[in-house]
Amino acid sequence: MLAFTHEFPHDLPPAMSRGHCILSHGFESGPDATKVTALADVAQRLGWSHERPDYTDLDARHEISRVGDVPARLQRLVERAAEMATRGPLVLAGSSLGAYISAITSLQVPVAGLFLMVPPTTMGPMPALDAAAVPISVVHAWNDELIPAADVIAWAAERKARLLLVNDGHRLMRHVDASCQAFEALLRGL
């Protein structure tokens, strides 16, 4: 299943947008999830084209791992990002598992920036979280029940990434607006 929710700014054809954002949802979420939808609205308003790939078919593959087929998820993003990077500036953004694959993809595909929400610093047998040396903005929750804040703080510090820590849990449900503001700051800074 290769489904994408893809939009270009209404008043700009794709070739005239500021760039393109690929917004990757978290595990057992979807392309219409609250956070990636809110980020799409920010990108649209700022003149960036955007898309939200659907990884739900891969997340459902529990026979591969408890978080589905992560290598196939990563490959799907790498292939799409490589295609879009040939057209102009590319920003990858994601939540949780979507943040992980966005960061790892940046090591293989040229990107202008990364926006990572509650990124896991480890992913079982997959490589530890790493990212290209590009502008990185991270939003993480002090009370994340899955990913210790201390691990993300250390990871962000090593890369001198912009880091916003909020009083919330892994889903960042009380900080969607704060996440959008941080994403807007990243896009405006590029």
Give, region by region, the residue ranges found by the protein language model.
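Active-site loop->helix "elbow" adjoining a glycine-rich segment at hydrolase catalytic centers
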Residues: 95-99
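Catalytic histidine neighborhood in serine/cysteine hydrolases
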Residues: 49-51, 156-172
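Post-His helix in hydrolase/transferase enzymes
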Residues: 173-188
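Conserved alpha/beta-hydrolase "acid-adjacent" motif
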Residues: 32, 145-151
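Short beta-strand/loop motif that positions the catalytic acidic residue
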Residues: 132, 136-140, 144
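A conserved short beta-strand
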Residues: 110-122
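Short beta-strand immediately N-terminal to the catalytic nucleophile in serine-hydrolase-like folds
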Residues: 92-94, 117
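Serine-hydrolase catalytic machinery in alpha/beta-hydrolase-like enzymes
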Residues: 2-89, 101-104
